Every structure is written in C-alpha cells, then in structure tokens.
Amino acid sequence: MSGVDRSSQDEPVPFGSLFFHVRRGWGAPVWVRGLLLAMVAGCTTVGPDFKSPTLTRGVSVLPDSPAQGTVAGADDQHFVAGQTGSQDWWKTYRCAELDRLVQIALDQNPTVEAARATLVQAGENATAIQDNLTLPTVDAQLAQTRQRFSTAAFGLPGGQAYLFNLTNASVNVSYPLDVFGGNRRQVEALQAQHEMQAHLWQAARETLIANVVTTVVREASLRAQLDATNALLQAQGELLDLTRQRQGMGALSLNEVAEPQAELAQSRANREALALQLDQIRHQLAAYLGQYPAQNPLPEFHLEDLHLPQFLPQAVPSALLRQRPDIRASEAQWHQATANLGVTIAGAYPNLTLTGSMGAMALSPGALFSPASSVWSFGAGVVQPIFHGGALSAAKRAAEAAVQSAAAQYRNTVVQAFRSVADVLRALTHDAATLEAERSIMEARQQSLGLADQQYQLGGISYPALLAARVQDAQARMGIAQAQGTRLADTAAFYLALGGEVDPAAVAQATSGSPSSSSGQSAPSEAR
C-alpha cells in the first residue's frame, strides 16, 4: 500500500464520466477546475422559447357580424362595443332562484370538485419537482453496523480477522447544477401543465353554469308548453263532445268524428311527452347541483321568472383567445410540449452534480464527538452522453412531433371556438326573428279569438267555431313558449361561447397548490 494520497495526483480522467473527491484541499486537475467553472459561469437554457400565439390582423368572427347595434325583433338585444363578459353573467337573467342554484352547483357539483382537485394535484406535483430540481437536497444519516474485517483484503499475509462495531452519523448534500437548462425546462413544462389544469377547471365551471341556466330555461319553456297543451286539450275535448252529439243526431258522419278524436289523442300523447321531458329536466338539474333527484325540493321556474339579457358583449377575436378556457388550455398544452422539447435537447448535454457530506465515524456511539472521528467529503460529477444507440435523436424527433401536434390542436381549438361563436351569433339573430313571427301569430290568433267570442255572444257563429278559435290560440301559445325558451337558452350559449370572464379570486383559491413564485421561474404564459 502506498502512503501517497491518490486524489492529489493528476490521473487520467475518462471523458464520458468524470468524478473526483477532495480531502483537505482542492486536488482536481487545473483543466477540470477550469472546465467546471466555465460550465457554471456559462449557464444557458437550450431548446426553443415558447411565445403566446396571436391572431392574424383582420380576422373576424363573422364577415358581417354586427360590431355594435341591435338584434332585430321583440325584446331587442344590443351588442355593446368595448364591453366584456361579466364574471356573473347568469345574473343578467334577473332571477334570484337561478342565482342561488348556480352557486349551489359551483359549490357541490362533483365534476367541478374533481377538476379542482386535479388542479391542486398538478400544482403540488409541480412544486415538489420544482423544489427537488432547483434546491439542494440535504439528508441526515445514522447507521450502526457490526463488521468482520480480514487483512487479506489488502494483500497482507496471515489473513488476521477483526470483529468490531461501527457507528456512522453524517449529513449528505446534493445539488444539481442546471448548466444547460434541462431542469429549468422541466419546471417550465410542469408549470404549463398546471396552467392547463387551471383552465380546464375554469372550463368545467363555465360549462356547469351554462348547463344550469339552459336547464332552468328549458324547464320554464316546458311548463309554458304544458299549460298551452292543457288549454288545447280542454278545447279539443269539448269540440269532440259536440261533434259526437251532432253525429248522434245524424248531422255528421263517423268520418267527421274521427278527425277531432285523432287530434285529441295526439295532443294527449304530446302532453305526456312534455311531462316526461319536464321530469327528466328536473332530474338533470338536481344532478348538476350534486344532489339526488328526490333529495331536496327544487323551485319551479316559469318564463315570467326569467328576463332576456338586453346588452351583450361584442365578440372580439383577440379577446376570445384570452377569455375562452379551452383555448387557454390548448395553448398551455402547446407550451408544455415546447418545454419538454427543451428537456429532451438538454439531455444530450453534460450533466453536472455537486455532492458533499460531513459527519463522524467511530467504533462506539460515545466516540462520535471526538475530533478524530470527523469525516467529510466533497465531490462533483459530470456525465456526458456519447452513444445511446440513436435513442437521443429519436427522443428529440418525438418531442418535435409532439410540439407540431400541440400546435395543430391549438389551431383546431381556435377554429372550433370561432365556429361556435359564429353559430350562436346567427342563432341569436334568427331567434329574434322567429320570436317576432311567433308573436305576430299570437296576436293574430288572440284577435281572432276575441272576434269569435263576440260573434258567439251575438249568435253569429256556433260554439264549435269558437272552440276551433281557442284551439288555434293554444297552438300559438305553444309556439311562442318554444321561441322564448330557445332565445333565452341561446343567449346562455352565447356567454359560454365567449368563455365568460375568469374570476381572479376563484382561480387564486383553487390554485393554492401552485408552484411558488419565489423560485425565480417566470409565468408559464410568458415568452422564454
């Protein structure tokens, strides 16, 4: 055995894996120290920097969409330039019971609760990995072992054996030097994933709100249609009774009785279908509230309880990109794929890790605190991938394909978002025209019914003729109930298509498990 400290000699160092340990001084070769200092001083971040996409100048939702003005028809709706979607847009219906149910749904709906839990999970995972990659790892170790040692292990003659106890207490420190930014890119990808989950949670909230509103609107419309159907059944029933009386007196044939009888049967079938839809709507509303169908009594809604929102925000293309949570989530997914490409690229560069430990080693626990028992070490390791059988190149190509896929998915999300806004804008225009036409029909039927009633009182027409006017009036009321419900529901669809407004307080509360901003990492949506 030589008494020379081998760590102080310049020995050949493998290029692929370099390790050195220091005792009582920095004994590394000069060129190694220079290389490490240059690598640390020249820290960079490899891979492409993500930049939030923007729309091409001149892009509009519809070629002839009104920038501001009025959707023609009864109960005009105005598109107001410069107005954005309200955080509480459902309150524009001015229905206190609807507001209460929306709040219950946001608090108790399992889907929204699951989305929030997934968001918190993503935030906590990002925080854990971020701290592990950017901060030193410190561990305490205490070991008590009993060993049998032979001098033959060192080539000494005789092979004398020793049996002893060994106590070891130490503190170990490890710190990865992120020279080429692989760790920073990994943290960036995790933050982008957390941002994506935040937007998915927001999308779940907005979808739930729209579903509650449209369900309430459908209930109110169905109740109005049921009321009109009941009035229709009453008039058709009386008309059938009179027809049968006249047939019994020989004034009418059996064929003339069959027609009103079939109409009455059809109306009864329609009433049962409407009643079934109403029951199913009530069950669906309870499910949105996170309740069982018969758990709690729900309020009844009528069209008179709901008011049509008159002032709607203008659909601005640039605002769509920032307001719709599905677009923001797709952008964050694109950002994550870009950051993962940087992680893959950094994997082909050298990886430097600093390690150190300090402690004591003695033959008995009582001797741990003696000066002679102290031990320490400091080391650094550099690993440079050289040949991995083409795995690194394949991984890079796969990461580049993932970026292209995420970019294409983002473009598709934007296109579909613009399509949905265009659809609902057209729907609002046609809904207003349809409602105006149904009201014209209603006014004409009511005028006809009033004249028929006057003529009947004067003996100018028969009672069957009066009943026929009542039947037409009931049918007109059914049409206007459907038109009112459709317009109210499409208005909710319009707010959903705009994406609503993100509530900063709600997002801050839900993202309580997000990565700490003190780490020095910039926001996921910012350009790197």
Features from the language model and the residues they span:
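N-terminal secretory signal peptides that target proteins for export/translocation
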Residues: M1-G27
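Terminal intrinsically disordered/low-complexity segments used for targeting and assembly
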Residues: S2-G3, D10, G34-D107, G155, ...
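Sec-dependent N-terminal signal peptides of Gram-negative exported proteins
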Residues: F19-R23, A28-C43
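Small/polar-residue-enriched beta-strand and adjacent coil segments characteristic
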Residues: P48-P53, Q87-D88, R94-I104, Q108, ...
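Charged, alpha-helical scaffolding/interaction elements associated with membrane systems
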Residues: Q108-N109, M249, L458
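Amphipathic alpha-helical coiled-coil segments
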Residues: A115-I129, A204, L208-A231, A235-Q245, ...
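Repeat-solenoid scaffold signature
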Residues: G248-Q277, G479, T486
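Short proline/glycine-enriched turn/loop segments at secondary-structure junctions
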Residues: Q295, L368-P371, Q482
